[in-house]
Swiss-Prot record:
It catalyses: carbamoyl phosphate + L-ornithine = L-citrulline + phosphate + H(+). Pfam families: OTCace, OTCace_N. Belongs to the aspartate/ornithine carbamoyltransferase superfamily. OTCase family. PROSITE patterns: CARBAMOYLTRANSFERASE. This is Ornithine carbamoyltransferase. One of its GO terms (molecular function) is ornithine carbamoyltransferase activity. Its main location: cytoplasm. SUPFAM superfamilies: Aspartate/ornithine carbamoyltransferase (SSF53671). Transmembrane segments: none annotated. It is an enzyme of class 2 (transferase). GO terms for cellular component: cytoplasm. Keywords: Amino-acid biosynthesis, Arginine biosynthesis, Cytoplasm, Transferase.
Length: 300
């Protein structure tokens, strides 16, 4: 049976820490390997991306493999044929599927019916590669994650969901602020709390950010939600990370954003360009974390 990375929970506690440590080691040593030598990874992107495509293509090459990239027009996941058929066919041609799509159910079906590893490069429900990369970005600076307080300010979107998942395996405190009606997945939150995750929810961004060591946000309208832009701008009034709000965090706090950022909406230009901003380190760490994840799915 192939190993999949469809969500952070696929790693389990031991796997999550193993991948985190391995990603740091790969970064520190400039690792190049042969794990994917002779293997072909199919990148299936229904949602366009700059960082995700480049970082995954480079990651595969650093591990000795090659890639085939399928555009949204070419992939047609579930439109021209059943997903289960697509999964079986691609499994006969290539060695791994790296999928960036809308519904999580598509990722899960590809994993269920294919015979090769499936890696979640983003869905509407989760962004596990990004959040694992963000944990790496914190871990580099604060190896004792039990001393870390993370603030999430904004939408209860796929990023928020994956942060909740990460809190199940890593011992940081997670304070999250959302406007009413924009909460994260309730069932996932329940699972995390039952697992002992230290997660606290509020409507007040000031309360969530007070004393935080790492301050996170994301766009207010994700891909596919453009028609909701005006309504969301009104709902998220007061949730913009500006100098005043950032000033409530820990004196040495760092600002994080998965990018692309809508400057002037969820974050000001002042904060993005400040010494507190570590968004470019986050972007780089996608490469190292994805190499570690690919190695994990291909290692018994």
């Amino acid at each position: 049976m192939p190993k999949h990375f469809t969500r952070i929970r696929d790693l389990g506690f031991e796997g999550a820490w193993k991948v985190l440590e391995r990603a740091k080691e790969m970064k520190d040593t400039g690792y190049r390997g042969r794990t994917l030598e002779g293997k072909v990874a199919t990148l299936i992107f229904e949602k366009a991306s700059t960082r995700t495509r480049i970082s995954f293509e480079v990651a595969v090459r650093h591990l000795g493999g090659t890639t085939i990239f399928m555009t949204p027009a070419e992939s047609q996941l579930g439109r021209s044929e059943p997903l289960r058929d697509t999964a079986r066919v691609i499994s006969r041609y290539t060695d791994c599927m790296i999928v960036r799509t809308f519904g999580q159910a598509k990722i899960d079906e590809l994993a269920s019916f294919g015979s090769i590893p499936v890696v979640n490069a983003l869905t509407d429900e989760g962004h596990p590669c990004q959040v694992m990369s963000d944990v790496l970005t914190m871990y580099e600076r604060t190896p004792d994650l039990s001393q870390v307080r993370v603030a999430w300010i904004g939408d209860g979107n796929n990023m928020a969901n994956s942060w909740i998942e990460a809190a199940m395996y890593f011992p940081f405190e997670l304070f999250m602020a959302f406007p009413e009606g924009y909460e994260p997945d309730r069932q996932l939150l329940g699972l995390a709390l039952e697992a002992g995750a230290k997660i606290f929810l509020t409507r007040d961004p000031h309360m969530a950010i007070d004393g935080a060591h790492y301050v996170n946000t994301d766009v207010w309208a994700s891909m596919g939600q453009e028609e909701e832009q005006k309504r969301r701008e009104a709902a998220f009034k007061g949730f913009c990370i500006d100098g005043a709000l950032m000033g409530r965090a820990h004196p040495d706090a760092k600002f994080m954003h998965c990018l692309p950022a809508h400057r002037g909406e969820e974050v000001t230009d002042e904060v993005m360009e400040s010494p507190a901003s570590i968004v470019w380190d986050q972007a780089e760490n996608r490469l190292h974390m994805q190499k570690a994840i690919l190695e994990w799915v291909f290692t018994e």
